[in-house]
Swiss-Prot record:
Keyword terms: Chloroplast, Membrane, NAD, NADP, Plastid, Plastoquinone, Quinone, Thylakoid, Translocase, Transmembrane, Transmembrane helix, Transport
InterPro entries per UniProt: NAD(P)H-Q_Oxidoreduct_6 (IPR050290), NADH_UbQ/plastoQ_OxRdtase_su6 (IPR001457), Nuo/plastoQ_OxRdtase_6_NuoJ (IPR042106)
Record membrane topology: Multi-pass membrane protein
Catalytic activity, reaction form: a plastoquinone + NADH + (n+1) H(+)(in) = a plastoquinol + NAD(+) + n H(+)(out); a plastoquinone + NADPH + (n+1) H(+)(in) = a plastoquinol + NADP(+) + n H(+)(out)
Molecular-function GO term, any one: quinone binding
Role this protein plays: NDH shuttles electrons from NAD(P)H:plastoquinone, via FMN and iron-sulfur (Fe-S) centers, to quinones in the photosynthetic chain and possibly in a chloroplast respiratory chain. The immediate electron acceptor for the enzyme in this species is believed to be plastoquinone. Couples the redox reaction to proton translocation, and thus conserves the redox energy in a proton gradient.
GO annotation, cellular component aspect: chloroplast thylakoid membrane
Top-rank taxon, per record: Eukaryota
Protein name per its UniProtKB record: NAD(P)H-quinone oxidoreductase subunit 6, chloroplastic
Amino acid sequence: MDLSEPIHDFLLVFLGSGLILGGLGVVLLPNPIYSAFSLGLVLVCTSLFYILSNSYFVAAAQLLIYVGAINVLIIFAVMFMNGSEYYKDFHLWTVGDGITSMVCISLFISLITTISDTSWYGIIWTTRSNQIIEQDFLSNSQQIGIHLSTDFFLPFELISIILLDALIGAIAVARQ
């Protein structure tokens, strides 16, 4: 989108605050339905970020796949769960919650220090220097594929690991 800089900055701040509030809603709301709706807000804000950066195909894929399919599937699965058994003897904070939060905070701090201390030069082995790319002959989906295999190789692989963890967690919850 061709927006003026103040409007673009306002939309970035607005979408960023929507992402932060939605993310907090996902992890802090006790009702799983509200948590799933907060996840939908996060995914919609992410797709709007893609629209702001002129990546319309990625934004449409984000909306169709994640909001339209996966989030609806999550809400559908949560509605079939028996919610009353999850709220019996509800304690606001337990010892396990404290231990878990300390482990998560320490992992987060170690991850941030690792990311800031790592030299990321040379991580991606396939670079643009050893490829002959004619931009005129490539479609948008081919350009996305090239970017995913060159510039965004590491984030793409990290997202696949996160999705694999989510799938394993969903299977573990479903088996109980």
